[in-house]
From Swiss-Prot:
Entry's localization field: Nucleus; Cytoplasm
GO cellular component, as recorded: cytoplasm; nucleus; ribonucleoprotein complex
UniProt keyword annotation of Cytoplasm present: yes
Protein's recorded name: CUGBP Elav-like family member 1
Function: RNA-binding protein that may be involved in pre-mRNA alternative splicing, mRNA translation activation and stability.
Cysteine disulfide partners in this protein: none
GO molecular function ontology, one term from the record: mRNA 3'-UTR binding
Family listed: Belongs to the CELF/BRUNOL family.
Keywords recorded for this protein, A-Z: Activator, Cytoplasm, mRNA processing, mRNA splicing, Nucleus, Repeat, RNA-binding
Native organism: Gallus gallus
BP-aspect Gene Ontology terms: mRNA splice site recognition; regulation of alternative mRNA splicing, via spliceosome
SMART domains, per the entry: RRM
Length: 489
């Protein structure tokens, strides 16, 4: 179906094939042509039909190709989310077809730097036109209208843009420039977001480094909750932008000793610290004195709780930190409280006598310190604790007591048993961690189980890890249902 006689047989090279939804099923190509030709000559219309019906019925959507790109964009501006067709409840949806995404503007747009400020748009067009048809050329100018010495050039195809890069990048030094011309693909919105987050994180790192708190674990009592909360926020933002940025975080001073998984543990620690700081105080006060860590352990063990012994057992895991506390002069309860950003809340707070939520938050915070201490002071930390737990728990399917078994959805495809174990170890003693594998494909099914030796650790893990973002996925962490339930999970 060709357009009017004043058009060639084929549409322009930069024409866009558009997908159109929310079209009445009773409309045919003729009806649609009358609608679209208001904005320009139409080359082709293809109504999508259900071939399983006889005769085939419209699916309420179509593809339309105008002769010119301009006509397609004008139609989109006038119709998309603007016009409701007869008999429909929602406005027309009009956007470039999926096949057009392969030729998106951001894939064809070049940034040209180090150009002479005497050049205008026409000069740039002449310079780059040998490499293909130029769709747009724009020189960046300041408020005074003067050139900033850089420009954007958009070709009609990516291949043309790549040819221009190979031929022109650093090929000459223009008048008034100190270095050769720069020709590269322009930053996409995703690139800009990643750079912004990395820059923001770098600034905060420098502030923390200036405070000299990371070089000495005993000095971490100066690390306030605002810093831990900031790390949690930045880690989540970065994961949303690009999972690869976690590697960038781990390479930045002064966090160079932490890998991506340990950074995630630190983020979980921040959430735990924040939860503990906001918890109402109970009846058993916990003071930030200079007593050794063992005092905290014994105090927790004797604190009253309405939920029985199960709510205080997790505090026994703090004994693993006594070696670290003893080996580090000056590292006492006050220092550890500062590290966990609890120094404000613990001074007047205490272990809850009702819900045990403060106890849970403390369990999260101090077990999280084990992960940080292992990364920051490996020579002082007893690595055998983690090694023994890893060997015994990863890949096994042992179950803990009632209420201590978790079901984890939306795991990244590449996660294995060991990754799952490391992610949930900060919240207590893991007796098993298992990622389920499809036996036919040998690939992860993206869900798994984690079992603790007590319910409080499981609740702590749910509180911090449910909704935690890894890459483009958010974990769903919930208790595994009782065997007595009709549905196992």
């Amino acid at each position: 179906m060709n357009g009017t006689l004043d058009h060639p047989d084929q549409p322009d090279l930069d024409a866009i094939k558009m997908f159109v939804g929310q079209v009445p099923r009773s409309w045919c190509e003729k009806d649609l042509r009358e609608l679209f030709e208001q904005y320009g000559a139409v080359y082709e219309i293809n109504v999508l039909r259900d071939r399983s019906q006889n005769p085939p019925q419209s699916k309420g959507c179509c593809f339309v190709t105008f002769y010119t790109r301009k006509a397609a964009l004008e139609a989109q501006n006038a119709l998309h989310n603007m016009k409701i067709l007869p008999g429909m409840h929602h406005p027309i949806q009009m956007k470039p077809a999926d096949s057009e995404k392969n030729n998106a503007v951001e894939d064809r747009k070049l940034f040209i730097g180090m150009i002479s400020k005497k050049c205008n748009e026409n000069d740039i067009r002449v310079m780059f036109s040998p490499f293909g048809q130029i769709e747009e050329c724009r020189i960046l100018r300041g408020p005074d209208g003067l050139s900033r010495g850089c420009a954007f050039v958009t070709f009609t195809t990516r291949a043309m843009a790549q040819t221009a890069i190979k031929a022109m990048h650093q090929a000459q030094t223009m008048e008034g420039c100190s270095s050769p011309i720069v020709v590269k693909f322009a930053d996409t919105q995703k690139d800009k977001e990643q750079k912004r987050i990395a820059q923001q994180l770098q600034q905060q790192m420098q502030q923390i480094s200036a405070a000299s708190v990371w070089g000495n674990l005993a000095g971490l009592n100066t690390l306030g909750p605002q810093y831990l909360a900031l790390y949690l926020q930045l880690l989540q933002q970065t994961a949303a932008a690009s999972s690869g940025n976690l590697n960038t975080l781990s390479s930045l001073h002064p966090m160079g000793g932490l890998n991506a998984m340990q950074l995630q543990n630190l983020a979980a620690l921040a959430a735990a610290a924040s939860a503990a700081q906001n918890t109402p105080s109970g009846t058993a006060a916990l003071t930030s004195s200079s007593s050794p860590l063992s005092v905290l352990t014994s105090s927790a063990g004797s604190s009253p709780s309405s939920s029985g012994s199960s709510s205080v057992n997790p505090m026994a895991s703090l004994g693993a930190l006594q070696t670290l506390a003893g080996a580090t002069a000056g590292l006492n309860v006050s220092s550890l409280a500062g590290m966990a950003a609890l120094n404000g809340g613990l001074g007047s707070g205490g272990l809850s006598n009702g819900t045990g939520s403060t106890m849970e938050a403390l369990t999260q915070a101090y077990s999280g310190i084990q992960q940080y201490a292992a990364a920051a002071l490996p020579t002082l930390y007893n690595q055998s604790l983690l090694t023994q737990q890893s060997i015994g728990a990863a890949g096994s399917q042992k179950e803990g007591p009632e209420g201590a078994n978790l079901f984890i959805y939306h795991l990244p495809q590449e996660f294995g048993d060991q990754d799952l174990l490391q992610m949930f170890m900060p919240f207590g003693n893991v007796v098993s961690a298992k990622v389920f594998i499809d036996k036919q494909t040998n690939l992860s099914k993206c869900f798994g189980f984690v079992s603790y030796d007590n319910p409080v650790s499981a609740q702590a893990a749910i509180q911090s890890m449910n909704g935690f973002q890894i890459g483009m996925k958010r974990l769903k962490v919930q208790l595994k249902r009782s065997k007595n339930d009709s549905k196992p999970y």
